[in-house]
Amino acid sequence: MSKVSPSPFAEEQAALVFVGNQFLFRWRQGDAVQSKFISPASVRAAFSAEPIDTGWLPPNIRRWGTGASGDWAVLSIPPMRHSLLFEHITRDIPTMMLDIPLPALVFMRIGSASYIWALKDDFAPDAPLYHAPLPNVNISGAICFGGNRLEGRTLSQAWQLFLDSPFTSHQTNGKSRRQPDDVRLLLASLHKRRRYPLRDLAPLQPRITVDQAVAALTRAQPNRYITVD
């Protein structure tokens, strides 16, 4: 705590001053002006009457936070089989339900946006990311939910919505070494198979890790791959 020169604002009783990335709380005490640095958590608590409660978190939540874009969380999904609905893989079959193995996945939700990536190995902050071998996911890993709305849905509900939604012919390229033009052709060949061929995963270019992707999205640190809207 320190004494500083009186404020130029004669009527000021207290003030919160932004000093770089820190917060300086300043108040009058008699004829002097006192000040001290306070943490962002203290500022948040002072301006919010509502307690922060994540609610019950699903298993494999790796990280949670909040920022300018809203609440965010990172979920890891181990390798497993999924039953997914695909549209128009072939001209004569409008829809097809496939029981397929998928690699380990990272699902991230931030504000109203959701992202998904694949992993070759176990989850780790420094693990390199690969394109999720699924349609309806753009080059940054952002998921297109079509007309489905995410507002009011929990992280688990958003993940389940992604699995339950039909996968279309949109954004099917660049996600498989064996089938670079349409990853659905690879997925159809994996129906009832036990394991996903990890060698077929397409790495993100340039290479980026889980931690770098999360930092780019949550701290507004764009890089050559992940762009912050």
Where are the regions a protein language model picked out?
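Compact alpha/beta protein-protein interaction domains typified by the UBC
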Residues: 4-10, 14-150
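Domain-scale recognition of soluble eukaryotic interaction modules
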Residues: 2-9, 125-229
